[in-house]
């Protein structure tokens, strides 16, 4: 009977916990409770975010992958919070100090910081001045002072605590020890810390100064800097952190100390007793300055950093998504050009399928001679003629602009139309030195591999960029300064979402691409490639079940994202999930034709009057039916086709050719908190400051522009000495 009652109590606690988390997520994400419950259930059942987002829309009310990832992240945090509460309650209860009021406060805490505040007085402590004073038997004296009711002077009261045995040499030491106990007690009071933290955030500021006067650095704007904590922008937080880390800046929090001390004294000193008030005033000041303020400063700075990192990771993720979703340039022979100075520019010719046809090195950049420049041009011209090169993909790293000038001059001497593109080469060197690149190009050196990668990035950016750690792609700000685990998880999520949005060709996709598909691990991705090599091409999606370690659950998660061109079933070339094939067959039958006719020379349109009724007849959800019809309208459509295509160039401008007021077309290369860098075809990217991005007020550049966008910009300033170009998108129609 007792066991049954205990089981009921545990069950009741778990249900309450579950409902608390559901309620919190509903409020935070501003969605319906049933949507959150469905999403949590699907996640707990082992379904991936891309699968839930694409194939379980009825269950979640069409929550997209971004909302689902936020939900998953917050779900993990809230569950971690509940685990922490459980651990804290258990620890305090074991000490016999758990009151109903304290229990209620802990259970109602909304953050880990508040739980830690409440637990602080009960947490096992290292040896402090207060614990040493307690060991010397001075706690009763501390309690006496705190009561503020003694008629005697504290010096008189303290005499009885002087003890050679306990190493309390005199009255002064006794009072000092008692004061240490009280200072720690005040610092441990959760309500005090919460109020002081809130006051500091509300009225405090972040202040920075230079460690050395008149030192030139990129942090000069922070040499005499102060901004309210509540208004400090994320990119400034990260810049201050970096300046401090590089030992150029001193950064601290300026708190409203007078206001805090005045309030804190009112809480601690309840009566004006001349015997105790002076001591308690000193206790409060010591407690705040020695114990509370440094801890609160650390917490606030950690919180500012965490929020700034989260914001930066979000920007990095959006930039990465745009880079990955750039449209492929298909059916073109591409020359990849990895620019460099001393070691020469590495070139690689890649055919329409991505196969490397030839590689070489030319030396047209400094230190060079006219003869070397001429030889480089002749080499490239011969390659263009021999391999019928259509495009040159130039990496945007060191010596890019010098290479660009050579290419432009050379193209004027070529009879056929060849254009070039400046390609983001971030991470190419990381890839070229990787184990994967060594396996792919065992006979190439790192430069040749890098050139091949730069060429392939133009042909299929997604397929090439997945081979690189997303953190190395570098379309963000301060990415090397932040929590690498959190950054890695977020960016891997972005890559996963992009790969699954596009889908992969099951018969050509590399293991690097396959491992990002929903439900597919690195091991299974390698097994798919091994199966393909041993048995030839896949002709049916269900053949995946023959792959080692790929069971029914993994098949359910991955099948809809795998495409088979020219297979047994034309639906295998679409994003229609195999679980819906029967419904599609019924749909075609109702329309009066077969799938073979539809995908062959038969009718090309499907007519539906009542989606709701038809969905019921087919045994699927109405949203799923809409998705199926959309897919059948453009089978196997690549969503990247809707993205802006890269600007192909055959000439280059010089900075000195720019004039204020010129309108130019450019490509957004990077988006950061304070603006966007745009490639306008000169030797330097221009900056569109956030204030120049839109005619209306915007909080962040991403509201208007993304990496890869082709935009019209107006030149508003040119600084040849500092090589800076100011651009504007305002007032351009």
Regions found by a protein language model. Give the residues of each.
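Long, highly charged, low-complexity intrinsically disordered interaction regions
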Residues: 21, 73, 80-97, 107, ...
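Short, ordered loop/turn segments at secondary-structure junctions
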Residues: 55-57, 146, 256, 339, ...
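Structured, non-catalytic alpha/beta "coupling" segments that mediate domain-domain communication
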Residues: 91, 105, 116-118, 243-256, ...
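A glycine-rich phosphate-binding loop feature that marks nucleotide/adenosyl-phosphate handling sites
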Residues: 198-205, 337-341, 397-399, 423-430, ...
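Single-stranded RNA-binding regions, centering on S1/OB-family and related RNA-binding modules
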Residues: 12, 567-568, 572-733
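Short, Lys/Arg-enriched N-terminal segments with co-localized hydrophobic residues
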Residues: 3-18
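Duplex nucleic acid-engaging cores and interfaces of nucleic-acid transaction enzymes
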Residues: 67-70, 77, 81-91, 95-336, ...
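Short flexible coil/turn linkers enriched for glycine and charged/polar residues
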Residues: 32-33, 45-46, 112, 138, ...
């Amino acid at each position: 009977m007792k066991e049954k009652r205990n089981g009921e109590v545990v069950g009741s606690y778990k249900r309450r916990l579950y409902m608390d988390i559901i309620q919190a997520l509903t409020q935070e994400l501003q969605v319906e409770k049933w949507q959150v419950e469905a999403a949590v259930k699907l996640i707990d059942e082992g379904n991936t975010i891309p699968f839930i987002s694409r194939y379980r829309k009825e269950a979640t009310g069409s929550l997209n992958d971004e909302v689902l990832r936020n939900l998953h992240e917050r779900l993990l945090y809230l569950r971690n919070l509940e685990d922490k509460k459980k651990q804290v309650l258990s620890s305090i209860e074991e000490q016999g100090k758990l009151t109903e009021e304290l229990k209620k406060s802990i259970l109602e805490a909304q953050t880990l910081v508040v739980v830690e505040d409440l637990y602080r007085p009960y947490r096992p402590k290292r040896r402090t001045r207060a614990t040493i004073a307690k060991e010397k038997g001075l706690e009763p004296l501390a309690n006496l002072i705190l009561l503020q009711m003694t008629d005697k002077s504290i010096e008189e009261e303290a005499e009885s605590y002087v003890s050679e045995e306990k190493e309390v040499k005199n009255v002064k030491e006794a009072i000092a020890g008692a004061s240490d106990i009280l200072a720690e007690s005040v610092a441990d009071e959760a309500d005090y810390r919460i109020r002081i933290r809130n006051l500091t955030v509300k009225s405090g500021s972040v202040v920075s100064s230079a460690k050395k006067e008149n030192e030139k650095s990129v942090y000069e704007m922070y040499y005499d800097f102060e901004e309210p904590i509540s208004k400090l922008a994320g990119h400034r937080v990260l810049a201050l952190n970096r300046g401090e880390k590089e030992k150029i800046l001193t950064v601290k929090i300026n708190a409203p100390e007078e206001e805090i001390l005045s309030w804190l004294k009112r809480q601690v000193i309840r009566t004006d007793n001349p015997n105790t008030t002076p001591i308690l005033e000193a206790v409060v000041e010591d407690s705040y300055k020695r114990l509370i303020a440094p801890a609160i400063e650390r917490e606030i700075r950690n919180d500012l950093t965490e929020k700034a990192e989260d914001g930066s990771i979000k920007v990095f993720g959006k930039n990465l998504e745009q880079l990955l979703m750039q449209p492929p340039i298909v059916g073109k022979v591409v020359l990849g050009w990895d620019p460099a100075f001393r070691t020469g520019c590495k070139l690689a010719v890649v055919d329409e399928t991505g196969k490397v046809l030839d590689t070489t090195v030319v030396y047209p950049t400094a230190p060079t001679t006219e003869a070397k420049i001429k030889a480089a041009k002749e080499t490239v011209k011969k390659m263009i003629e021999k391999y019928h090169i259509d495009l040159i993909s130039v990496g945007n790293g060191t010596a890019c602009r010098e290479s660009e000038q050579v290419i432009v001059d050379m193209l004027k001497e070529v009879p056929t139309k060849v254009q070039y593109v400046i390609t983001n080469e971030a991470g190419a060197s990381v890839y070229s030195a990787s184990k994967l690149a060594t396996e792919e190009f065992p006979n190439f050196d790192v430069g040749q591999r890098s050139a091949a990668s730069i060429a392939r990035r133009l042909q299929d950016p997604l397929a090439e960029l997945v081979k690189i750690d997303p953190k190395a792609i570098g379309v963000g700000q301060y990415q090397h300064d932040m929590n690498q685990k959190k950054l890695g998880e977020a960016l891997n999520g972005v890559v996963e979402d992009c790969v699954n949005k596009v889908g992969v060709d099951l018969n050509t996709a590399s293991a690097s691409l396959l491992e990002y598909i929903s439900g597919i691990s690195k091991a299974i991705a390698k097994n798919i490639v091994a199966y393909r090599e041993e048995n030839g091409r896949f002709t049916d999606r269900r053949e995946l079940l023959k792959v080692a370690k790929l069971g029914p659950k993994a098949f359910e998660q991955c099948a809809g994202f795998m495409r088979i061109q020219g297979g047994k079933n034309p639906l295998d070339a679409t994003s229609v999930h195999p679980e819906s094939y029967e419904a599609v067959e019924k749909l075609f039958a109702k329309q009066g034709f077969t799938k073979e006719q539809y995908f062959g020379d038969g009718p090309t349109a499907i007519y539906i009057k009542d989606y709701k009724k038809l969905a019921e007849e087919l045994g699927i959800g109405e949203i799923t039916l809409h998705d199926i019809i959309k897919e059948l309208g453009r089978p196997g459509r690549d969503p990247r086709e809707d993205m802006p295509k890269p600007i192909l160039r055959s000439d280059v401008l010089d900075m000195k050719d720019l004039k204020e007021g010129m309108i130019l077309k450019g490509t957004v290369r990077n988006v950061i908190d304070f603006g966007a860098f745009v490639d306008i075809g000169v030797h330097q990217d221009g900056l569109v400051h956030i204030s120049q991005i839109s005619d209306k007020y915007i909080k962040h550049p991403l509201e208007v522009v993304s990496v890869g966008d082709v935009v019209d910009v107006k030149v508003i300033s040119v600084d040849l000495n500092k090589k800076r170009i100011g651009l504007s998108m305002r007032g351009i129609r």
